[in-house]
C-alpha cells in the first residue's frame, strides 16, 4: 500500500458559523484566523511541500482547520482551482478537505467533485445530541447521518469522521455508543481527538469556573481504547489519536488542561497490550517448568513493553514468582497488534486487539 502524504493548507476557523466551546483553530493550527490564503501563497506552499514528496507516495492537497464548504464560494473556487491544476497535471492524486455535517448537500458535493475533491472529513465530534448541544456545535446527530448518506452517493470520495471524546456532558458509555454508531455509518477512516482545554475557548472559562473537568491522561487512554475497539473490529482505520503536537500547541499557555501527550496513540496501544498480556497470563499454566516464549511484531515491541518497560517487567515478575521463565521473541511474520506465545516447542497461540 502506498504511503499517504498530505500537502497541508490551513484555513483556521474560516467558514465556521459559530464558536464551538472547544475550538480555537488559530492556536491549534498555529495560523491566525485573519490570515486568508491567496493564490500566490497557496502555490508557494504547495510547491515547497512537494519538494519533500517521494515517488510512489499518494499525495493529496489538504485544506484543514475550518469548515471549507462554509467559506465564501469565490474563495472556495480560488483554492480549488489552484489545487485542481496539480491534480490535472498528475503532481498530486486528489484534494482533501474538512467541514461541518450541516454544510454538506448534494449540490455542494457536485461542486466539490467538479474540482477533483477525493476526501471529505466531517467533524461529527459526538453522536449524542446532549453532548453536541452542550458543546454548541449547532447540529444534531441526525444531521451527521444525513451528511454521510449524501457523501456516500459519490463513490469516488473517501469519507472520514472525527470524534472528540470528553466534551461537556460526555461519558465513556456515550463515547462508546458514538463509536458503535460510527461503525454503522461505515466511514473509510476516523480520527480520535480527546478534548483539550485550549486558551481562548469557552471551554477555558468553563474549566476556570469549575463547570467542566477534562479527562486525565489515564481516562483519555482508557476511553480511546474502548472507542477504538469497535472500530478495529469493523476494519475502520483510526488514522490519528490525539492532536498533532505542533510547536504552537507545545507553547506555554496554549493547552491549559486535558490529556495532551505527543505520543498519545502509543499510550493507547500500550494499554491494549497490557490487556493482552493479562489475558495471556490467564490462559497459560503458571508454575510450569517449561519456558514461555512471547512473540511480537518488532514494530509493536515498544508498546508491549510499556512506559519504561513496566508492562513487560510486571509480567516477568508474576511469572518469576510462580517459577516460570519467559523470553520475548520478535517475529515479523506475526501480524501487528497481536500477541503470540508458546511453551518451548509447542504450538503458537495468539490474541489480537480485536479479541478484547
What are these regions (language model features)?
Residues 2-5, 212-356:
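Auxiliary Fe-S-binding modules of radical SAM enzymes
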Residues 4, 56-58, 92-94, 117, ...:
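A general structural motif
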Residues 60, 94-96, 158-160, 291-293, ...:
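Residues at or immediately flanking beta-strands
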Residues 28-40, 65-158, 163-221:
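Conserved non-cysteine loop/helix-boundary elements of the Radical SAM core domain that shape
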